[in-house]
Amino acid sequence: MSVPVAPFSHLSTLWVQVTGTWCNLQCVHCINSSGPTDPWLKSLDTETVKRHVMEAEALGVKEIYFTGGEPFLHQDILELLACSLRVAPSTVLTNGTRITEKTADALAALAGESLYSLELRVSVDDIDPEANDRIRGKGAFDKAIRAIRLLHARGLLPILTATEILQGDGPEGNGMYQRFRDLLASVGVTKPRVKIIPVFPAGRLAQEGGGPPDPG
């Protein structure tokens, strides 16, 4: 029996695990067991990332995503975003803890001068700060909400990203989306955006004894 072969026509999406598994949090459900110590996957150097972005451009890439680990731990993340935004719409998946006013200003400037759109997904796993921090680490909730407010104030319309299994219901159950929309409205976000994603039984969630330290 022959297996059908689909011809390669173009690259749809480029995912860049820019800081490998290096992260300042150690979330209990992290699919690749990222954390602050001894990352099993190292960060990518700046020139390597730029080279792959250019290769992706030649292959017709339509979207570029930066993930980790925590992308904002990379010392050249803004430079890398400037590079990717010349090629395709770009998205950063972040815990938000490293986004300061200065960083938010720089991101807004990048978005304003770029041909393509910049999107930021900020992870929050519960509307209750204590419940969220049991999952993500002490202080993570307040820092993530601050990041969302900073980005929103600059017109960047960040997406709050939550994991459905930790809410105890599916994405349509018990008003999960509305709970997060209400949370965003309560902190002054006038155009709330919420994305619910599944949690996979892999990485730290599949291990015993994994737990979140304080964010650095």
Where are these regions (language model features)?
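Short Fe-S-cluster ligation motifs
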Residues: R51-T67
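Radical SAM enzyme [4Fe-4S]-AdoMet core and its adjacent flexible, acidic
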Residues: S123-D125, P129-G216
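Hydrophobic faces of well-ordered beta-strands that scaffold small-molecule active sites
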Residues: L14-V18, I64-F66, S90-V92, L118-V122, ...
